[in-house]
């Protein structure tokens, strides 16, 4: 705590109040779901801390929140702690605060508008045309990396070029940038539309803040993606996570939806012009 000032703690609290007010004004319901879960979503390179007596600390409340959508909730948000093993640095901490929000019967374009409006609220001095530049993933790779991931998929090259070429180029653009429409191989939990996944990530001055999907609600396709992710984790000698079949079985009840995960600590960092996560929250 020694790196955090009282003024910063007060400003962080004001930002959290502003976030809640923003969603309350739009008739969202704030929800709470379990922090200790039995079955995380299997994703390569995202490791949830295991608990001694079984289960895991969540990396995201995503699966649990989607179950609420399946029950009939329409607009929900949650602010709370999340955990990822092995992530520590100026922008990372094993424990961090996340906000996720979801809308039934909407797609990623509506969440993009939410994100733009929220940033306008949190960054009131930012020029409007600096809040929401849209960059297509395919065009970004063609221009800044010199190849097309759709023509010849290479996961390692895609990830390497994202970190060394695409994100530095986004930083040079300044302000808010939506990097949108990913290859299907990088769809994660996003719905496909033709040869693209309806997914975007939002950056502010080059720092990734948020990751959004039009949600995949096809039971069999999602089960297949989870099985493929489990196989990839096994090949990398990473921990195996059981599949949450309650989540899988709930997907047809959702119909259609979109949602986003936004890192609160990073949002506070950019709002207060801090360059170290330790300046805005307690860290290990």
Describe each model-derived feature in a short phrase.
Residues 18-21, 34-71, 75-104, 145-284:
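A translation/RNA-centric and nucleic-acid-associated enzymatic feature enriched
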Residues 16, 20, 24, 112-119, ...:
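Hydrophobic face of alpha-helices
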Residues 11-15:
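Aromatic- and glycine-enriched glycan-recognition loops and surfaces
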Residues 1-7, 144-145:
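A short, surface-exposed helix-loop junction/capping segment
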Residues 91-153:
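A conserved active-site cap/scaffold subdomain adjacent to cofactor or substrate pockets
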Residues 30-32:
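Short beta-strand elements
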Residues 8-9, 23:
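Auxiliary tRNA-acceptor-end handling modules of aminoacyl-tRNA synthetases
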């Amino acid at each position: 705590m020694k790196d955090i000032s009282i003024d910063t703690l007060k400003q962080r609290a004001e930002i959290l109040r502003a976030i809640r007010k923003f969603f309350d004004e739009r008739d969202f319901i704030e929800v709470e779901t379990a922090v200790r879960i039995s079955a995380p979503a299997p994703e390569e390179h995202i490791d949830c801390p295991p608990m001694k007596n079984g289960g895991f600390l969540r990396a995201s409340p995503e699966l649990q929140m989607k179950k609420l959508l399946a029950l009939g909730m329409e607009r929900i948000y949650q602010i709370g702690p999340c955990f990822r093993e092995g992530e520590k640095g100026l922008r990372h901490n094993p424990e961090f605060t996340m906000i996720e929000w979801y809308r039934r019967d909407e797609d990623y374009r509506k969440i993009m508008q939410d994100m733009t409006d929220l940033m306008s609220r949190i960054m009131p001095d930012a020029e409007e045309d600096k809040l929401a530049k849209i960059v297509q993933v395919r065009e970004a790779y063609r221009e800044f990396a010199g190849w097309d991931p759709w023509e010849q998929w290479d996961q390692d090259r895609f990830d390497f070029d994202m970190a060394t070429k695409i994100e530095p180029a986004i930083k040079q653009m300044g302000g808010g940038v939506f990097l949108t429409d990913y290859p299907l191989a990088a769809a994660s939990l996003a719905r496909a539309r033709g040869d693209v996944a309806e997914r975007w990530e939002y950056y502010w001055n080059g720092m990734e803040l948020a990751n959004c999907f039009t949600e995949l609600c096809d039971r069999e396709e999602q089960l297949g993606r989870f099985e493929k992710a489990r196989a990839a984790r096994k090949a990398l000698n990473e921990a195996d996570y059981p599949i949450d079949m309650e989540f899988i079985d709930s997907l047809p009840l959702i119909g259609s939806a979109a949602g986003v995960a936004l890192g609160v600590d990073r949002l506070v960092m950019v709002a207060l012009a801090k360059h170290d996560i330790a300046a805005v929250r307690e860290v290990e």
